[in-house]
């Protein structure tokens, strides 16, 4: 029954992933087992540590792996929330845009902004407004 349902979904255009964070995919690989169990607010610091050293290429690799994995599961469309802040600047957004273009024939990628640092701080808001 599940096989039949899956095939009907694929025949009707495929699965849709309505909420993803492809720029953060696979970043936990760089965290220790202890760090992976920290509270969410502490994990944000770990993400900042990752983002401090991540290049556009790093983000492209994460996003591309995610897209290929999604395609493998029958997903044909996704909305990914990309970090835009004072650490990432535009790196994750540029990478997501690049991968959107690269896979446009096979995968419909929508890009949304993740405002994890908020918009009340003038610097954070300025960076966000530059890219949306």
For each predicted feature, which ranges?
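Generic intrinsically disordered, low-complexity segments enriched for polar/acidic and small residues
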Residues: 16-19, 47, 78, 90
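Histidine (H) residue identity feature
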Residues: 19-21, 39-41, 103
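Histidine-rich, glycine-flanked metal-binding segment
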Residues: 1-13
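Active-site gating loops and adjacent loop-to-helix segments of metal-dependent hydrolytic enzymes
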Residues: 25-59
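Active-site loop-helix segments enriched in His/Asp/Glu that coordinate
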Residues: 51-132
């Amino acid at each position: 029954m599940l096989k039949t349902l899956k095939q009907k979904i694929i025949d009707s255009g495929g699965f849709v992933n309505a909420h993803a964070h492809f720029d953060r995919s696979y970043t936990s690989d760089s965290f220790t087992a202890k760090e992976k169990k920290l509270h969410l607010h502490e994990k944000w610091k770990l993400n900042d540590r990752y983002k401090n050293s991540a290049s556009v290429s790093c983000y492209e690799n994460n996003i591309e792996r995610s897209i290929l994995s999604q395609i493998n599961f029958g997903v044909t469309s996704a909305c990914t929330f990309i970090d835009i802040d004072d650490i990432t600047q535009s790196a994750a957004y540029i990478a997501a845009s690049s991968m959107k273009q690269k896979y446009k024939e096979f995968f419909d990628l929508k890009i949304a902004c993740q405002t994890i640092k908020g918009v009340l701080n003038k610097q954070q808001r300025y960076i966000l407004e530059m890219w949306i």
